[in-house]
A protein has these predicted regions:
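Extended helical coiled-coil dimerization/tether regions that scaffold
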Residues: 17, 23, 27-33, 203-322
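Loop/turn-to-beta-strand initiation segments
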Residues: 323-325, 354-357
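RecA-like P-loop NTPase motor core
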Residues: 346, 350, 365-465
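Walker B catalytic acidic pair
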Residues: 330-331
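Conserved D-loop-proximal element of ABC-family nucleotide-binding domains
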Residues: 337-338, 342, 369
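Short, small-residue-biased leader/transition segments that mark boundaries at the very start
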Residues: 1-7
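P-loop NTPase switch/coupling surface
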Residues: 13-217, 233-237, 423, 443-465
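Conserved H-loop
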Residues: 361-362
Length: 465
């Protein structure tokens, strides 16, 4: 890590790495595991009553616009954040007015809508390695979200908080985080008093499920840790965060294109800096804040996840990236080049092996990239269906068979449909005109044009009786 730092007192930074020398036993993450195995949404947004089994590692939510992808993610976030009922330093997401399902009805030819209650979010899952069920509900427009059916989860979280607050505690705190579509641009204004109020492991939960992002806490942590490393020497969990960023950047830009990737915070820039040698042997250095949207979107998210793990569980040292938890990401492909979309899920699960990911996407590259993903297909009527793995399938096949989108522009699809219709009617002269139009647009050797030409020639052949 860079020695390019200014001096200041180290007290705050020291307190953030208490417990550094603790040696955790192997397999700690199994005892600390957190995940949702089954999510049920009743009258939640456009879901009347949907039961959604989830994979412990990777869940990909797909569907057309308006089918409920973001709604499902909000339901999952409502469920996962229930853990914060037992944590004094974070608040769970409540069931809100906009979460209530509406149904339309007609009275004397006038269409109206009514709200449908109760709204319920319920789960079966694992918390701190123990099987657990919990539920939250909203019974009416003037009611508050109930928590009675989540008492077991609240008790587990409260006990974890008490144990984690003890000196030299080995208790592992799970990470819960949400990254919405505004994660790059919708910056939340951080409060000045927040740093004074939170000086503990639980700072890792600050704004972790906020719909608007803030990098203030992230930059403060990097600044403090860089200063501490320059004074005290290497800190294992800080090195782990650094490695996470270096690996992701190298994967994004392609290992063959770069060498000697180094990521560090530099006080001179007041930013995280990426330094590497490119394929031409030239040295490059870029502040992360000045990089393209694609790089910043991924690196900011990875940095935020990794540093929160380091704050929550400094006692894990070099194994801090094995922190368990649940991370929810809306439109995982946001700002990413198609080549990066193919790698992002595998990168995330490799760097953070004990996290359960629930992500939404429109991208066929993302859908086909992960071997054992749980694919959840949503339709406009509020249904959620598990479908077979699309791993390794042709992108055009996914567009047609899963996303129900043609792999050509609509105008071209219509021309091919017209050609087939004319061929069926044996109107070969007009079919030939359409074919010639397609040849001009797509080229004589286009595979689909070639097939159409063969079909026309076969239909026009005179067969012996």
């Amino acid at each position: 890590w860079s020695s390019d730092v200014c001096s200041s007192d180290l007290d705050y930074a020291h307190r953030r790495v208490l417990g550094l020398s603790i040696c955790m036993k192997s397999g700690f993450w199994k005892e600390a595991a957190m995940r949702i195995d089954n999510l049920t949404l009743k009258n939640f947004r456009n879901f009347e009553n949907a039961e959604i089994p989830l994979n412990p590692k990777m869940n990909i939510v797909i569907g057309n616009n308006g089918s409920g992808k973001s709604s499902l993610l909000m339901g999952a976030l409502t469920a996962a954040s229930t853990f914060f009922l037992g944590i004094d330093y974070a608040s769970p997401r409540s069931i809100k007015t906009e979460d209530v399902r509406h149904v339309a009805y007609e009275t004397n030819k006038i269409y109206q809508q009514r709200e449908v209650y109760p709204v319920e979010v319920s789960c079966q899952g694992v918390i701190n390695g123990n099987a657990c069920t919990w539920s939250r509900s909203l019974s009416g427009p003037k009611s508050n979200t109930t928590y009675g059916a989540a008492s077991d989860l609240k008790k587990i979280a409260s006990e974890l908080q008490k144990k984690a607050a003890l000196p030299s505690s080995q208790t592992v705190l799970p990470l819960i985080a949400y990254y919405g579509t505004g994660r790059l641009w919708a910056q939340k204004q951080a409060k000045q008093k927040e740093k004074q109020k939170l000086k503990s492991r639980f700072e890792g939960y600050q704004d972790c499920i906020a719909e608007q992002a803030t990098d203030k806490q992230l930059m403060e942590w990097f600044s403090d840790m860089t200063l501490l490393v320059s004074q005290e020497g290497p800190i294992p969990q800080v090195s782990a965060v650094q490695r996470a960023l270096e690996r992701c950047f190298a994967d994004l830009i392609d290992h063959d294109e770069t060498q000697h990737v180094k990521v560090e915070y530099r006080q001179r820039y007041r930013a995280i800096v990426v330094e590497y040698v490119n394929r031409n042997g030239e040295h490059e250095l870029h502040p992360m804040s000045e990089m393209s949207d694609g790089y910043r979107s991924v690196l900011n998210m990875v940095a935020d996840i990794a540093h929160r793990m380091a704050v929550l569980n400094p006692q894990l040292g070099d194994s801090v990236l094995e922190t368990p938890g649940i991370i929810i990401i809306d439109e995982i492909e946001l700002h990413l080049h198609p080549g990066w979309q193919k790698r992002i899920l595998n990168d995330l699960t490799t760097v953070f092996p004990n996290i359960q990911f629930i992500v939404s996407t429109h991208s066929p590259e993302v859908i086909t990239s992960y071997k054992d993903a749980n694919l959840i297909l949503l339709k406009h009527e509020g249904s959620a269906t598990q479908i077979d793995s699309a791993y390794g399938k042709d992108v055009n096949t996914v567009l047609r068979s899963i996303l129900l989108v043609g792999d050509r522009p609509i105008e071209i699809e219509k021309l091919f449909d017209k050609f087939s219709e004319l061929l069926h009617k044996e109107d070969y002269a007009k079919a030939k005109e359409v074919l010639e139009n397609l040849e001009q647009i797509l080229g004589y050797n286009d595979p689909s044009v070639y097939d159409a030409r063969n079909s026309l020639e076969i239909e026009q052949m005179e067969w012996p009786e």
